[in-house]
Amino acid sequence: MKKAVCFTLLIIASLLLITAMLFTCLQFCMNQRDWYYKSYVKYGTSRETGISDEDMTEAIFRLIDYMEGRADSIQLSVSENGSVVEMYNQQEIEHMIDVRALYQAWKNVRDYGAAAAAAIIALCICMTAPGGRIRLMSRAFITASAIFGIALAALGIWVAVDFNSFWNSFHRLFFTNDLWLMDYNTCRMIRICPLQLFNDIVIRFALMFMAPFLLLLIFATAVARRRQK
């Protein structure tokens, strides 16, 4: 009975750790100023926006600074087609208030979740015999990884089959207004976030997460098999 309880708790702890890894990798991926500049140069985005690569980099990183709590406002002045303009309109400013609140909420989930996972692991170490602790934790991580994999596969199928449905549902789930429905002609935020940039961020984030995750999964699988023998 005690072992079953610990196993369930360790699955929860593993899911919390996976969530913490996800957010940490996303945070690290986003906070790369030079990468944005190099991407704008590579895509030739300035030809479409009329804004220099330097100004676009400052503009997108101001959004990140705001989300992280390092800036009080997203607003800044940029040069667009030779004229100095305010980068963001009121809709974008109000939408980013919601985005920052969501980002900070997930940051808290990461921080408190990691602390809770550590507490659960410590508790289970005290509740189980020394000989079976590592294998039990490994089995729990493998189970949690399977749950995560199933959820990720289902999400991936949804995205592949109907991306618009996924995108709209995502925003309606986390936002209670329609500020996220922006017009390309009036919202510069959309223009400095082309599809190529978004796709590259997703790929970088996925690779950054999968590397440590797969290493942990391989280690857990090896431990579980060795202990079983």
Which positions does each model-derived feature cover?
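Alpha-helical transmembrane signal-anchor/signal-peptide segments
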Residues: Q27-E48, H171-R172
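Terminal transmembrane helical module of multi-pass membrane proteins
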Residues: D178-K229
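Juxtamembrane non-transmembrane "cap" segments at the membrane-aqueous interface
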Residues: W158-N185
